[in-house]
């Protein structure tokens, strides 16, 4: 990914933890009450399958060999074998597969070695395994799955970002979509913006995401409070929508339905 400081072409010294080091550190910190769980991510080492196997082994050793009862979140490698991802889900509380960018075009331009179809297929397989486990009352990624979108590395507006999130929630039953504001990096590609987006944009997207998941708003309704497909950075999206829909107010709390009360 051209926007990542740890990309393959980046001129930085590489380092890694062995499975034993990850397990040892996690157990030691957990026993001292420094941590409540482990979030484990990795660049690709040797191959997607090798990397996914190493992550799965770390989680398995924690559970089986050390009786680790803390939270484990594994960042799965979408190109890895479905079997390895399934094995990881047996030991992790949550799996996540990064969608990275809101559009296929942006992914091709800024992360050419990643394939949107492969990412979505892997997310679909995780959802299937989670649904099967619920029906059979067995353990598989009980805290569900999540994903992440980089915001501001491409030209996509907030309407596109939220529309993608809405599809992800509906199609893959995600628990969360995380938004990460693009941060300029040294020796970056000319395809990337020179400046980072306003940090407030990330905050507004998280607020909008809450409206999407719990308040019954559609992406178009949410962005209608701003201009040009972007959220208003000065006021929260719920207030922005209300100001653009003054005809819906005031509301009589004694007779209004739940949907209107939420808004």
Give names to the regions the model predicted.
Residues 70, 143-145, 172-175, 208-210, ...:
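Structural beta-strand/beta-sheet cores of well-ordered domains, especially the beta-sheet scaffolds
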Residues 120-126, 155-237:
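A structural motif corresponding to the C-terminal lobe/cap of the Radical SAM core domain
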Residues 236, 240, 248-263:
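Helix-hairpin-helix
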Residues 143, 204, 254-257:
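N-terminal alpha-helical segment
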Residues 6-147, 151-156, 168-169, 183-194:
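Conserved Radical SAM active-site core
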Residues 1-4:
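Short cysteine clusters
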